[in-house]
Regions:
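Proline-centered helix-kink/hinge sites
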Residues: 29, 57, 73, 89, ...
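A transmembrane-helix-recognition feature enriched in membrane-embedded lipid enzymes
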Residues: 2-57
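Alpha-helix N-cap/helix-start motif at coil-to-helix transitions, marked by capping-box chemistry
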Residues: 1, 27, 31, 118-121, ...
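Phosphate/Mg2+-binding loops and adjacent switch elements
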Residues: 96-232, 237-239
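Walker A (P-loop) phosphate-binding motif
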Residues: 42-110, 215
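Short N-terminal or domain-adjacent regulatory/targeting segments
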Residues: 39-47, 230-241
Length: 241
C-alpha cells in the first residue's frame, strides 16, 4: 500500500485497527493547531489586512479540499470564454514544484512556451500548454504576478489558479470546485482529513461547481446539494463531469 493510500485509509476511517485509531487521534491533535492557524489568518484577511486590490477583474478558481477537483479544465474553460469575448486573460499560478516559486516568472505568452517544465513545474507547464491564447505566470506572491500581467503583458483580466485560500490578492469572483466523490474531505481539516480550511469558508464563495458528478450516484449528488443549501443557501451550485 502506498503512503497516500495508507493515509486515506486512516483519515477516511476505513482502517479500523488499533494503530489506525491511534493515528487518527494524533492527526486530530495536529488538525486543531492547523485549524487555529487558518482561523487567525482568515480573520486578518476578513479585516482587509494584507490584501492587494488590482485595477482589472480577478476570478479565482479553487477548492476547499486537498487533491484534484478539476481546476485545470475550469481555468481553461474560463480562459476560452474570455478570449472569445475579445479579452486578454492571464493565469496566475503558484507554480508547485517549480525550480524557484519565490520568483515570478512568465512561462507562456499568447500560447508560446517560454520556459521548460523543470523551471515552471509540470502542473503549471501543462496548464500553459493547453491555453493557446492566454498567458501564464507562476510565483508564490500572486499580487506581484498580477502587476507583471497588467504592466508587461497588458492583461485586462486575471484568473487565479488554486486561489481560494490565497487571499492576499483581492478577487471579484470566487469559484469553488467540490469533488462529488469526496465533497467534504472526511469532515476534518488537514491532516486529520482533507479540508484545507473549515467548511464555513465556503461562505466566501460566489459560485460552487460540483465536479465528477458522473462518478457518483444521483442520490449522492442530491445529498451534497441539500447539505450545501443548508450551509450556504444563497450561493448557486452547478454541476460538471
Amino acid at each position: 500500500m502506498s503512503g497516500e493510500a495508507l493515509f486515506k485509509s486512516i483519515v477516511s476511517g476505513e482502517d479500523q485497527s488499533v494503530l489506525g485509531d491511534i493515528a487518527r487521534s494524533s492527526l486530530g491533535l495536529l488538525s486543531k493547531g492547523y485549524e487555529k492557524a487558518v482561523s487567525i489568518r482568515n480573520a486578518r484577511f476578513d479585516e482587509g489586512k494584507g490584501v492587494t486590490k488590482v485595477t482589472v477583474p480577478v476570478i479565482s478558481v479553487g477548492n476547499i479540499t486537498a487533491g484534484g477537483t478539476g481546476k485545470t479544465p475550469m481555468v481553461r474553460f474560463i480562459c476560452d470564454v474570455l478570449t472569445q469575448k475579445g479579452l486578454h486573460p492571464t493565469v496566475l499560478s503558484r507554480g508547485y514544484r517549480a525550480e524557484d516559486n519565490n520568483k515570478n516568472i512568465i512561462i507562456s505568452k499568447d500560447g508560446t512556451m517560454l520556459v521548460e517544465p523543470s523551471i515552471s513545474g509540470d502542473e503549471a507547464w501543462l496548464l500553459a500548454k493547453v491555453l493557446q491564447k492566454s498567458n501564464v505566470i507562476i510565483g508564490r506572491e500572486r499580487s506581484k504576478s498580477a502587476e507583471i500581467a497588467i504592466n508587461e503583458l497588458g492583461a485586462d483580466c486575471l484568473i487565479m489558479d488554486d486561489g481560494f485560500q490565497h487571499r492576499a490578492l483581492a478577487r471579484d469572483i470566487d469559484i469553488v470546485l467540490i469533488d462529488a466523490s469526496n465533497p467534504f474531505g472526511y469532515e476534518h481539516v488537514l491532516p486529520r482529513g482533507l479540508l484545507r480550511e473549515p467548511l464555513s469558508g465556503l461562505q466566501r464563495a460566489d459560485i460552487i461547481v460540483l465536479t465528477k458528478v458522473d462518478q457518483v450516484a444521483p442520490g449522492i449528488v442530491s445529498g451534497i446539494r441539500k447539505r450545501l443549501t443548508q450551509m450556504i443557501p444563497n450561493i448557486p451550485v452547478y454541476e460538471t463531469t
